[in-house]
């Protein structure tokens, strides 16, 4: 099976999107939804339907999204990372219709148009889509940081790990890091006879 090459944001590109000052309130909301998706792996349809009831707090005070994928009905769970938690806290008291978390307007096409403005202000050389946030989660936020593919697959709500392999790219930097760690481990295991 041949996999399509998927795009994702690098860590520095994601940071530029997080940091950028935006002139428009709604563009800011759309940027925040994009960043939230990049840090949780949610798709547009999942973030659009996300309610406060989908956010659960465990015994240690950690907040988790526990829900079912809109597309497949597969359950997923993902912990809110600190920036995602800050974004959630920004909108939790808005009292939106249906107890929704984000005040998103329009379709994914409308959101993608807004993300073009975000990209321009953030200095990106391409126009990201909301779906690119999911690929960024799989690649930059999780796999590159050492999260196992099986765990990423469960957090994305994939039924088959082969689907996750399409989303996730192992970067050359990650290969270098892993090989350096392996070399260090093996140096104490194997010795060349003199």
Predicted regions and their residues:
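Basic, Lys/Arg- and aromatic-enriched nucleic-acid-binding interface segment
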Residues: 1-44, 48, 145
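C-terminal catalytic core of Y-nucleophile DNA break-rejoin enzymes
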Residues: 2-4, 70-89, 97-117
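Conserved tyrosine-mediated DNA breakage-rejoining catalytic core shared by Y-recombinases
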Residues: 13-18, 40, 49-89
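Catalytic-site neighborhood detector that most strongly recognizes the C-terminal catalytic loop/helix
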Residues: 8, 69-73, 156-181
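Short basic/aromatic active-site micro-motif
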Residues: 29-33, 105-108, 125-145
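C-terminal catalytic core of tyrosine-transesterase DNA break-rejoin enzymes
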Residues: 35, 39, 45-46, 117, ...
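Extended hydrophobic-aromatic, low-complexity segments
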Residues: 26-27, 45-48, 57-60, 75-78, ...
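C-terminal secondary-structure termini that scaffold catalytic or DNA-interacting sites
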Residues: 182-194
């Amino acid at each position: 099976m041949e996999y399509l090459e998927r795009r994702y944001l690098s860590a520095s590109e994601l940071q530029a999107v997080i940091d950028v000052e935006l002139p428009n309130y709604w563009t800011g909301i759309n940027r925040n939804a994009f960043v939230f998706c990049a840090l949780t792996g949610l798709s547009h349809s999942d973030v659009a339907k996300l309610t406060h009831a989908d956010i659960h707090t465990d015994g240690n005070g950690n907040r988790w999204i526990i829900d079912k994928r809109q597309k497949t009905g597969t359950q997923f769970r993902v912990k809110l990372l600190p920036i995602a938690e800050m974004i959630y806290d920004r909108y939790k008291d808005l009292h939106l219709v249906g107890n929704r978390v984000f005040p998103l307007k329009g379709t994914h096409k409308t959101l993608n148009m807004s993300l073009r403005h975000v990209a321009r202000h953030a200095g990106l050389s391409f126009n990201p889509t909301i779906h690119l946030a999911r690929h960024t989660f799989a690649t930059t936020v999780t796999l590159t940081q050492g999260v196992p593919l099986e765990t990423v697959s469960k957090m994305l709500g994939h039924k088959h790990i082969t689907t996750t392999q399409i989303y996730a790219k192992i970067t050359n930097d990650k290969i270098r890091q892993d090989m350096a760690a392996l070399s260090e481990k093996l140096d104490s295991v194997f010795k060349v006879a003199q």
